Amino acid sequence: MKLHELKPAEGSRQVRNRVGRGTSSGNGKTAGRGQKGQKARSGGGVRLGFEGGQTPLFRRLPKRGFTNINRKDYAVVNLDTLNRFEDGTEVTPVVLKEAGIVKNEKAGIKVLADGELTKKLTVKAAKFSKSAQEAIEAAGGSIEVI
């Protein structure tokens, strides 16, 4: 096979259908838009969610919930990720960022108790779950809320 013998796979290339170019084309006159009406006009058509004047679904359904403006979003760190540090290390948000464990600190760091901690560490973070606090202290480490 040579370069000039290459051909696209059968049916992979189709010619664009040019509508409104004479009745003999099969897509002339109304150009696939049917007879008159809103959808036949240029720029015609109804807006998203419009149901012909009937109250649309999004307005028939009740509103639900709200967004709490006081919500704080914490960056989560689990115990098994803290195992990569050496014994006796002081783990701070800066150290976590440098290690690539946390990309965005958000409202602070919260330590959760997923996995097991085997190292003795001093962990400094904004929040700790109760079980994470117990696990860190059980491993001989200490916590500090900052």
From Swiss-Prot:
<dbReference type="InterPro" id="IPR036227">
    <property type="entry name" value="Ribosomal_uL15/eL18_sf"/>
</dbReference>
<keyword id="KW-0699">rRNA-binding</keyword>
<comment type="similarity">
    <text>Belongs to the universal ribosomal protein uL15 family.</text>
</comment>
<feature type="region of interest" description="Disordered">
    <location>
        <begin position="1"/>
        <end position="51"/>
    </location>
</feature>
<feature type="compositionally biased region" description="Gly residues">
    <location>
        <begin position="23"/>
        <end position="35"/>
    </location>
</feature>
<dbReference type="GO" id="GO:0003735">
    <property type="term" value="F:structural constituent of ribosome"/>
</dbReference>
<keyword id="KW-0689">Ribosomal protein</keyword>
<dbReference type="InterPro" id="IPR021131">
    <property type="entry name" value="Ribosomal_uL15/eL18"/>
</dbReference>
<keyword id="KW-0687">Ribonucleoprotein</keyword>
<feature type="compositionally biased region" description="Basic and acidic residues">
    <location>
        <begin position="1"/>
        <end position="10"/>
    </location>
</feature>
<dbReference type="InterPro" id="IPR005749">
    <property type="entry name" value="Ribosomal_uL15_bac-type"/>
</dbReference>
<comment type="subunit">
    <text>Part of the 50S ribosomal subunit.</text>
</comment>
<dbReference type="InterPro" id="IPR030878">
    <property type="entry name" value="Ribosomal_uL15"/>
</dbReference>
<dbReference type="InterPro" id="IPR001196">
    <property type="entry name" value="Ribosomal_uL15_CS"/>
</dbReference>
<dbReference type="Pfam" id="PF00828">
    <property type="entry name" value="Ribosomal_L27A"/>
</dbReference>
<dbReference type="GO" id="GO:0019843">
    <property type="term" value="F:rRNA binding"/>
</dbReference>
<keyword id="KW-0694">RNA-binding</keyword>
<dbReference type="GO" id="GO:0022625">
    <property type="term" value="C:cytosolic large ribosomal subunit"/>
</dbReference>
<feature type="compositionally biased region" description="Gly residues">
    <location>
        <begin position="42"/>
        <end position="51"/>
    </location>
</feature>
<protein>
    <recommendedName>
        <fullName>Large ribosomal subunit protein uL15</fullName>
    </recommendedName>
</protein>
<dbReference type="GO" id="GO:0006412">
    <property type="term" value="P:translation"/>
</dbReference>
<comment type="function">
    <text>Binds to the 23S rRNA.</text>
</comment>
